């Protein structure tokens, strides 16, 4: 037993040293320095060293002794400071070991790879862990200053025994992975300093009795407990864990598909073997115990590809097998079509592989030229990756059904994962599909041409985008890159996918819908308002309803009513100018509106509205996408491209939208029925702001308006005629007063409801017979509206006079018809000071009572 243990330790040390050497060989000098010094900087804590902060900061790595390069660094510090004090060695030091994991040291490591470092610490660290985390954060910043991307992960040595999981935002994948995270660590870990990993010493056949076997090794003195890092065994995985982990890999593959597709397929291979899955880490350990140092030194990336290849061959999926090989080749980043003198071992391995795959020189040249791929190749690659991921997703769903899963990932994590998949892949009208998730660094085009095809032609009407100058030969011989009915969508697609840049030459054939100057303005406005790179959506954002973050309202891009004013004399009064009901014809000067917005899930959406109701439809759409508890958009811009009155139209639209958004987001249960009237093309519309929705209703007359804002709408047969064609009760004629709105209620006999006579400010009359409902509620709602809505109307709307309406009841007293003020408790709480005209009318009504 002793000899066997010593042999295993020697193999472990040899494999670890091979991995360290390979890791350093693939690194640039700055990377090598950071990798070498990190253990020293975690072992010591000194003001002259990176990562220093005041306080009692845990430091010191168990069993650490510096190598030659590390000692040279320590000597240089001591020359400036004097002898460094060693960490307090009473008992165990706080850091059990420092390990790099992932692609580091494997064939998958490239010059641009980042470093994932596990800092495993004693369980008793507890409250001091936060200070160690701060030290690690300072070391990350120091490494970034050297051009090296390092991420530290603090790991309690008992974490996996207690089945603790981090949040979805971290690299440890939230609650969806536990054993699988440990599986990756065990197969890829490189010990930089500290204790050896105990799991490697336990034979695969003893995995089910891991703890008992470890105790027997300690009891027999074969191993000393304080010399080993024990994170626990790899227990059998549940189907739920495979499901959650696979969803997580799909989540990662959205932003970095080439990097994640291999891991995604490994998990699919695991689930295909379930319940008899043999983890890759266990296979590597079994070969280590047998002395079979295969797969180019048990390279974890090569072994991962081998396992995936076996699986895809078994299910006869040659399409995804070819894809995963290309992803592997691109991840290694060796460029075999070009001569190189460095990293010989990686180049030799990759050469053997591509020869076995039967790849041609042309394919190698194409893959090695990935940095210069343009939209055609990128779109093809995107579709291929998307198909592969969706196939993995379908297989995953079948796996879940086959095993009657109750998913172990928390509902919140699953919701976040599903939301991101939806946001990235669901194709919806108006949604801008982003086709370049780290596939190629530069999709910019030298020329972009936008061509409009009117209705009635062979091709469908709309806009076509070409990456050619507008010569007939070039256009005819090429397929369009993209088509859409509306120009805004094409510009957004080209901009957000990186084809349209500041150096792109723009061309347009717009059939008078849009010219080059307007197109250039649009591109400039969009690029200045929408940054291309934004932070990834947080798990909290993905778990919540999506909200508009950046909004652009694009006015009169394709249809500009003011273009008709050219060479005409247009008479208007600026003091009474209403761009939504302009001039004697009451014309709406907003002919088209395009919306362009990015939401909190980082989706980019476009919408188009045209015609006289474009403003109203756009308003309803914007407000409908804002739930009542949403945050205000971070930015809201109105871009107007009218030939005339551009500034005024832009200002009016901005004011209207801002007012409506404020009303929408401030509506509460305590104040239902918030309202705004908008006059468009001579017609007045009411926008009603409820907690759950925003509705619009055309208001052709006063009672339609009053009924609409009443919780208990009146029901009756409206009869609307001119004053000279109707006989009002004489008592109403006698009380009519210009300048205010007056309501007269007249009860019908035999419970047939009541009539309403309404006189507006000009004494125009509307009559409604046989109305039903509550007069009290009608009076209350109308009065509430008048007392609180002085600023709710757009410019030019004279639909309502803001003097408080007067309400009267027609009654029979002493055989005579009389008018008395309507007694309503609803009016008692309204603190409105009547105008002098109101006072005069009130006196008049009081006199009438006495007649």
UniProtKB/Swiss-Prot annotation:
It comes from Dickeya chrysanthemi. The lineage of its organism: Bacteria, Pseudomonadati, Pseudomonadota, Gammaproteobacteria, Enterobacterales. GO terms for molecular function: adenylate cyclase activity; ATP binding. One of its GO terms (cellular component) is cytoplasm. It is found in: Cytoplasm. InterPro entries: Adenylate_cyclase_1 (IPR000274), Adenylate_cyclase_1_CS (IPR024686), Adenylate_cyclase_1_N (IPR024685). The gene is cya. Its EC number is 4.6.1.1. Residues 540-851 are annotated as: Regulatory. One of its GO terms (biological process) is cAMP biosynthetic process. It comes from the Bacteria. It holds the Pfam family Adenylate_cycl. Belongs to the adenylyl cyclase class-1 family. Residues 1-534 are annotated as: Catalytic. This is Adenylate cyclase. It catalyses: ATP = 3',5'-cyclic AMP + diphosphate. Keywords: ATP-binding, cAMP biosynthesis, Cytoplasm, Lyase, Nucleotide-binding.
